[in-house]
Amino acid sequence: MSTRLGSHTSPGIDYPDRDGQPRSDNTLQFQWIVTIKEGLEALFRDRPDVFVAGDLLWYPVEGDNKTRTAPDTLVAFGRPKGYRGSYRRWEEGGIAPQVVFEVLSPGNRFGELLRKFKFYERFGVEEYYIYDPDRNDLVAYRREGEVLVEIAEPNGLVSPRLGVRFELTEDSFEILGPDGRRFQTYVELARERDELQTRADRLADRLRALGINPDES
């Protein structure tokens, strides 16, 4: 069960839950953010010690409400699930999110990307993934000591923390769970559910035609 975690922030300093920036610049970017975030939520649904969030402000330093950023998706291992207005590291056992994703849009500027890269490198992110849906391009970084190092070939890469595999073709990008199932959009999941229900209904009709009641155990 999800709960809202209590706040233990020192009085006198305000840590806003919003930074005034839009959640996404276009529908394609938003679709990918939701697909990645919800796919990871589903993947770790039985792990109470894995917290996944989208567009949540992360404050790494107590007493400093200016140093902050909001990853499109973050994953923090060793932290309980629950509702948060922001991710304040000093209230999270000193644990920084280990994995972050950014989904680019035409509005993303180089300066903003550089700022975020330096932020993630400085504050302990282990894996950093940047996907550009317009160019169908993936850039991946992995921590080596104190720095984030770019992975030369991200296609086929398996995330050490998440256990997911990234597959790039000329015109598509797929994230595959450890079971090989692709992360899907809500529409794709709904369509799959409807197809399964249709098959189940047809099977039930065949059983009834044979004089078997499928509703009886």
PLM segments and residue spans:
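A generic secondary-structure signal marking the coil-to-beta-strand transition
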Residues: W32, P48-V50, P71-D72, P97
